[in-house]
Regions:
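Conserved SAM-binding loop of SAM-dependent methyltransferases across substrates and taxa
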Residues: 113-125
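Class I SAM-dependent methyltransferase Rossmann-like catalytic core
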Residues: 67-90
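Conserved SAM/SAH-binding beta-strand->alpha-helix loop
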Residues: 135
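Conserved SAM-binding strand-loop segment of SAM-dependent methyltransferases
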Residues: 150-161
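Conserved alpha-helix/loop element of class I SAM-dependent methyltransferases that forms part
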Residues: 85-102
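Mobile active-site "lid"/loop adjacent to the S-adenosyl-L-methionine
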Residues: 178-220
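Conserved SAM-binding loop
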Residues: 142-143
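Conserved beta-strand signature within the Rossmann-like core of class I S-adenosyl-L-methionine
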Residues: 202-206, 228-235
Length: 496
C-alpha cells in the first residue's frame, strides 16, 4: 500500500477558534514567539523550564517524563508552551476528526491536557470519549477544561499503561506521539549501506519493543480494542528504520492498514516538519494478508537542486555536451535576452539551464523521476507573460543581486533516499577512494570518492537510510577530496 495524499487543515475554522479559546496563538517565526514567551514568563521560570527539559532528555525514565508534563499542565503555562504546537494540533486534529465516525466509544491514549480530546467530544456529542494519561496534573486540567466547556460525553482518567489494566472495550483507539516515545531510537538498520531493505529478525524486533516500551503499551491497547475496532495512530516514525520497526510491531499483532498512511506536514514555528505517517488500522480478518510499505517515501521534486553563477555555468556547459532536448528564448525589457535549455545527461540527470544577457546564470538538475516536473518548469517559462517572468526567475533561483557565487558550491547535491538511484545510475563510475565503517550494532557507513564521465562525485550512505550525493566539475574535484578526508576523521557523517 502506498501513501495517501496529504490533507490541508487550513479551512478548519472551528478548530482554529477552538485552539484560540485555550489561549494558543499561531507563530510562523521563532523571534516573534520567543519575544512573546519572554513577555509572559519570568527569567526564573524560563531557567526552571530549561533545567526541566535538560533533566527529561537526560534519560528515558518514566518519572522524568511525568514530572515534565505535570509542570507543563499549569494553566498559565499551557498557552505559552503549547502555542509552539499550534500547527501540529491543527493538522492532526483535522486529519483525525474526519476519521472518527462511525465510532461510538473512543479512547484517547496519552491525551495530555485534553486539547484534541475535548475538541473531538465537542464535534461529536453523541460519541463517548475517554482520555487517559500518566500525568495526574494533565488529567486535572483536562477535567477542568471539559467542565468549563460543559462537555458531558467525555471523562479523563490517570492511567499508567501497561502497569494498570485498561477497563472496558472501545471501537476506536487514538494515539498521537504516545506509543513510541523513545525519540533517540533509530529503529531497525538495513542489511547494508547499499539497500533500504531490512532482515526479518524477530529476536531483534522483540528486543527493541521491550527496550522502547512499545510492547507493553501496544499489547495493553489491543486488549481494550473491540473485535471490529480501529486504531488511529500518529507517531514519530518518519525515519524509515523507526517506521519499519513500528509497522512490524503492528503487523505481528495482526493489524493491517485499512486506508493509505498519510504523511503529515506542519509548521513548528519557522521549521517545516513532515512526520508520521498517520495510520488507520484494524485487525485482519481470517484469510486476509496485510500489505505494509517498507520503501522510503519519495517526495515529488526531492531530487531537484538549484545553483547559480560559476557552478551553474560550469555544470551547464558540461550537461549541454550530451543531449539538449528543447530550447526556448526571448527578450525581456528589464532582463535582456534570455535562453533556457532543457536536456538529459546520460539518461541519468534531467536539467534546465537559464541564462540572460545581464550575466545571470541559473541551473536546475534532478533525477529521471522528476523529469515531468522539470519539463513543466520549462513549459511555464516558455509560455509565461513578461510581467510574471522576472518574478518566476527570482522565485526559482533567488534575486540575482543576492545570488551566492561561491566557488565551493557543488554543481549538484542530494540528501534524500533518491540519491542512491542517481548514484547507482552514474555512467562510467571510477572509484578513486572508499571506506566502510562498522560498529558491531548493525550500524555501517560507507563513503566513496570517484569520477563519472568528466565530473567528480562524493557518495555517503549508512544503514539508517541517510544518503548524500555531491557532483562537481573536475576542475574543482579537490573540494570533494577535502570533504572525503574530513569525513574519515569524523565518520559519524559527512561535513555539512
Amino acid at each position: 500500500m502506498g501513501y495517501g495524499r496529504e490533507e490541508s487543515p487550513e479551512g478548519n475554522l472551528d478548530l482554529i477558534r477552538y485552539l484560540q479559546s485555550w489561549g494558543l496563538r499561531e507563530f510562523r517565526d521563532e523571534a516573534s514567539y520567543y519575544q512573546w514567551q519572554r513577555s509572559i514568563l519570568s527569567e526564573e521560570e524560563l531557567r526552571d523550564l530549561g533545567r526541566l527539559i535538560e533533566h527529561r532528555h537526560g534519560g528515558e525514565q518514566v518519572d522524568c517524563d511525568i514530572e515534565f508534563y505535570d509542570v507543563l499542565a499549569r494553566p498559565d503555562l499551557v498557552p505559552v508552551l503549547y502555542s509552539q504546537r499550534f500547527n501540529y494540533f491543527l493538522t492532526l486534529g483535522s486529519s483525525i476528526c474526519s476519521r472518527i465516525p462511525p465510532a461510538n466509544r473512543v479512547l484517547d491514549f496519552g491525551c495530555g491536557v485534553g486539547i484534541l480530546t475535548s475538541f473531538f467530544a465537542q464535534q461529536y456529542p453523541g460519541v463517548e470519549f475517554v482520555g487517559i494519561d500518566r500525568s495526574s496534573r494533565s488529567i486535572e486540567m483536562a477535567c477542568l477544561e471539559a467542565e468549563k466547556r460543559q462537555l458531558t460525553n467525555i471523562r479523563f482518567e490517570v492511567s499508567q499503561v501497561p502497569q494498570y489494566q485498561l477497563s472496558g472495550t472501545y471501537d476506536l483507539i487514538l494515539s498521537t506521539q504516545a506509543l513510541f516515545q523513545a525519540e533517540r531510537e533509530p529503529g531497525l538498520p538495513s542489511r547494508s549501506w547499499r539497500t533500504f531493505q531490512r532482515e526479518e529478525d524477530f529476536k531483534r524486533q522483540e528486543q527493541l519493543e521491550i527496550r522502547t516500551g512499545l510492547q507493553g503499551r501496544l499489547n495493553a491497547l489491543l486488549s481494550a480494542l473491540g473485535p471490529v475496532g480501529r486504531m488511529i495512530i500518529f507517531e514519530k516514525t518518519w525515519n524509515l528504520g523507526r517506521r519499519i520497526f513500528f509497522q512490524r510491531a503492528l503487523d505481528v499483532r495482526g493489524l493491517r492498514p485499512i486506508s493509505a498512511p498519510v504523511p503529515c506536514r506542519y509548521w513548528s514555528l519557522d521549521e517545516a516538519v513532515i512526520d508520521g505517517p498517520l495510520y488507520e488500522v484494524s485487525r485482519l480478518s481470517k484469510g486476509e494478508s496485510s500489505v505494509w510499505n517498507e520503501e522510503p517515501y519519495r517526495e515529488p521534486g526531492e531530487t531537484l537542486y538549484r545553483c547559480v553563477g560559476r557552478s551553474a555555468h560550469r555544470m551547464g556547459l558540461e550537461l549541454a555536451l550530451d543531449q539538449v532536448l528543447e530550447t526556448a528564448s526571448g527578450i525581456h525589457s528589464r532582463m535582456g535576452s534570455w535562453i533556457f535549455r532543457f536536456g538529459l545527461w546520460n539518461q541519468v540527470l534531467v536539467w534546465g539551464f537559464y541564462e540572460n544577457s545581464s550575466g545571470f546564470k541559473g541551473l536546475v538538475i534532478g533525477g529521471e523521476e522528476d523529469r515531468d516536473l522539470l519539463h513543466h518548469v520549462f513549459e511555464t517559462i516558455k509560455q509565461i507573460q513578461e510581467p510574471d517572468f522576472e518574478r518566476l526567475v527570482r522565485d526559482f533561483w533567488g534575486h540575482p543581486a543576492n545570488a551566492r557565487d561561491d566557488s565551493a558550491i557543488p554543481c549538484y547535491e542530494n540528501h534524500h533516499p533518491s540519491a542512491q538511484n542517481i548514484y547507482e545510475a552514474l555512467p562510467s563510475k571510477h572509484i578513486q577512494q572508499e571506506s566502510t565503517f562498522q560498529n558491531g550494532e548493525g550500524r555501517e557507513m560507507h563513503i566513496e570518492l570517484g569520477a563519472t564521465k568528466s565530473l567528480a562525485y562524493l557518495y555517503w550512505a549508512n544503514t539508517f537510510d541517510q544518503r548524500q550525493l555531491v557532483l562537481i566539475d573536475e576542475e574543482r574535484a579537490h573540494i570533494l577530496k577535502a570533504y572525503y578526508r574530513e569525513s574519515l576523521e569524523s565518520p559519524q557523517g559527512p561535513p555539512a
